[in-house]
Amino acid sequence: MKYDHQSIETRWQKKWEDSGIFQCDTEADKPKYYVLEMFPYPSGNIHMGHVRNYSIGDVVARFKRMQGFNVLHPMGWDAFGLPAENAAIKNGTHPAKWTFANIDNMRSQLKRLGYSYDWQREVATCTPEYYRWEQLFFLRFLEKGLVYRKKAAQNWCPKCHTVLANEQVIEGLCWRCDSAVEQKELTQWFLRITDYAEELLADLSKLENGWPERVLSMQRNWIGKSTGAEIRFALDGRDDSITVFTTRPDTIFGATFMSIAPEHPLVEELIDGKPQADDVRAFVERIRNMDRIDRQSDTLEKEGVFTGAYCVNPFTGRKMPIWVANFVLAEYGTGAVMAVPAHDQRDFEFARKYDLPMQVVIQPQGETLDPATMSAAWTEAGALVNSGNFDGLANEDAKQRIADDLETTGNGRRTINYRLRDWNISRQRYWGAPIPVIYCDACGVVPEKEENLPVVLPLDVKTHDDGRSPLPHTPAFYECTCPVCGGKARRETDTMDTFVESSWYFARYTDATNDKAPFTPDALRYWLPVDQYIGGVEHAILHLLYSRFFTKALRDCGFIELDEPFANLLTQGMVLMDGSKMSKSKGNVVDPTEMIARYGADTVRLFCLFAAPPERDFDWSESGIEGSYRFVGRVWRLVEELREHLLAVGACSSTAEDAKTPVARELRLKEHATVRKAGDDLNDRFQFNTAIAAVMELVNALYLAKDELVADESGRKVLSSAVSTVLTLLSPFTPHLSEELWALLGHTESVSTLPWPRWKEDALVRDTVTLVVQVNGKLRGKLDIPADASREEVETLALNEPNVLRYLEGVTVRKVVVIPGKLVNVVVS
């Protein structure tokens, strides 16, 4: 019978769906395991990256079920956002119609791959049933002061017609469309993620055993904790002051000028009436539209312009010119920097360029620095000089002493600064969750009443070809009454950043059909945290950081009782073609649907899992998938050939008594060694490729042993046990093949419901060993002897081996060398 993957796979997929075999419920008396892959944006078609990601998750889910866990393995759709809206506009259709059609198609594709999802828990973030709870969270965050509204310069994508969070600007470009990002003054809604900066940083230690160090490091760097001091510098000739943040208070005596960001709120006041005003304004306008990442680059050419204003160094009393500089960012620290050119490289380059004064205040041991001859700033340790009462102190000690002085005199204070900025969630686009606030001329900003949720996104609107939102031009949506005074009011027409939806979806899966609450405490308590999360490393400082923040904020609002959402994280590698990332523009895309039609879902899954360890990239290759296809066929033919013999003995687990011959004993040993190897690889390391390789070796051993073992019943029992083990071990990887062959062997239960095989210690002990026998170093025979034979017994058996005896005639045996478990060498003369 030919292996017809098309009919076999679709038949088993229907059986699984009809039986609800992968649906799960909260079972307090059973250990749980929650495995989750990052849900996709419904683009219309899955790609090979999806296949690899979801195949990894499915192996984990199936393996954990076989280990006895109650497994939650859900799937849904990250369905709001710019990509869907832009694609729908491009194709002349409504985003809702486009999105739901794509969801239907992708759901079918995922089912065709045989993934063991609990489809009853499916969510789509663009449905009111989902985002109503998100709007509830917004209102509770607003109550708690975790949401606020402010006007500020924002990252603006001119092509997408919306703002971007700092994390969504990659090297000055929009993360979605690669357009150059501009700065634009807008009033926006923000989430206070900075309130959790220290906890987000500290709790990374809880994830050290479960998350890749690379991701932890990326989050540490993004949060960017700096310990230092704020120092106030009086403005010369004014009753005002300017505050700086510095990590180097020990260098305060070396501060010779001040650098401030072009966006600093004091710029206009400082230049008012000064002859430099026009030059400063032109410089500010030019620099504000530069990429902020570029402005932080070490290779950036340092530029600045003098404001005409001065401040006063609180320790030296020296007047310091105030410059606007391109490398100072308003959002870091206070947007002002005390410039110490002798001990900071950026300040050094700036001072050299504009001929500004330089004062050495830290001398290295055994060396005297001279500003006139220095080729670079001295940024290492040393002793303070030219620093008044602090001369001679080691600079680390001086940091504390000078900070003490600042706090005593009131000129400053110790503080901690973070690179992390609050999360701007306002988007000026249509396809997103409405922000549930109302603007009333009499009452101001008013939250929508919870009983009025959801604020439904209207579907009967016409989107604009240029991407502008139709909501500000849709009176039926924005015209409303104030919940406080009942007067005429206007609804917010911005929508939420789509990363808000993906920041809590993992919690909704625990109780996805609940229409009274986002989830119940019992469901959350049982299922969370996610035991294994799987997705790309590109989400390290976007989705993963936002989800951690959201979990903590929901905890503080009484929704959740845990600190971290994901106990373990696996970041899978990419699927490449000829060393490059697959993309339509490069024309190097492999269509999963085409591969499934040609080779079958099991083969596609198997190749994606066998090609490389999950965290590494791998190159797609026709020879590789052909090899996986041949292996699937080889397993099919093996069982088909042995079927009648195996049906005769029935299902069995062979015993030591069944393994009567060396071949039988060797196959039984191989079977149990494979169970141990595959289990260890899946359980501890997720090394799917080596687990598959071990099963392949067992299949090879079966082919070598089958002809001898089918001859008697005990041998057939050993064969039956090994074949059953192969099908069971393969079922997480090639579930359709395993189900079909299991059924062909007369079993009525699903192989997916079987327990993971157990290996036996006694089966891994060889009771005989094979030794080679040499005479004067040349191979003359082989011995199969008991593993526990004594040295004397080994010598006797070797000297009496028939072939060896021929070489001992007429010679004298001088000595016998025995290397246990390997060889015997008879030395003669």
UniProtKB/Swiss-Prot annotation:
Give each disulfide bond as a residue pair.
none
Q: What name does the UniProt record give this protein?
A: Leucine--tRNA ligase
Localization annotation = Cytoplasm
* Family statement drawn from the similarity comment of this UniProt entry: Belongs to the class-I aminoacyl-tRNA synthetase family.
- What's the chief localization of this chain? cytoplasm
> Which of UniProt's keywords are assigned here?
Aminoacyl-tRNA synthetase, ATP-binding, Cytoplasm, Ligase, Nucleotide-binding, Protein biosynthesis
> Which molecular function terms from Gene Ontology are attached?
aminoacyl-tRNA deacylase activity; ATP binding; leucine-tRNA ligase activity
Q: Name one Pfam family in it.
A: tRNA-synt_1
Q: Which reaction does it catalyse?
A: tRNA(Leu) + L-leucine + ATP = L-leucyl-tRNA(Leu) + AMP + diphosphate
- Give the matching Gene3D superfamilies: 3.10.20.590, HUPs (3.40.50.620), Isoleucyl-tRNA Synthetase, Domain 1 (1.10.730.10)
UniProt GO BP = leucyl-tRNA aminoacylation
Tell me where the sequence motif 'KMSKS' region sits in this chain: 581-585
The EC number of this protein is 6.1.1.4
The protein's matches in InterPro entries, at most eight in alphabetical order, are given as: aa-tRNA-synth_I_CS (IPR001412), aa-tRNA-synth_Ia (IPR002300), Leu-tRNA-ligase (IPR002302), Leu_tRNA-synth_edit (IPR025709), M/V/L/I-tRNA-synth_anticd-bd (IPR013155), Methionyl/Leucyl_tRNA_Synth (IPR015413), Rossmann-like_a/b/a_fold (IPR014729), tRNAsynth_Ia_anticodon-bd (IPR009080)
- Native species: Nitratidesulfovibrio vulgaris (strain DP4)
Q: Which CDD domains match?
A: Anticodon_Ia_Leu_BEm, LeuRS_core
Q: How is this protein annotated for GO cellular component? A: cytosol
Coiled-coil regions, chain positions? none
ATP-binding in keyword set:
yes
User: Which ranges belong to the motif 'HIGH' region?
Assistant: 40-50
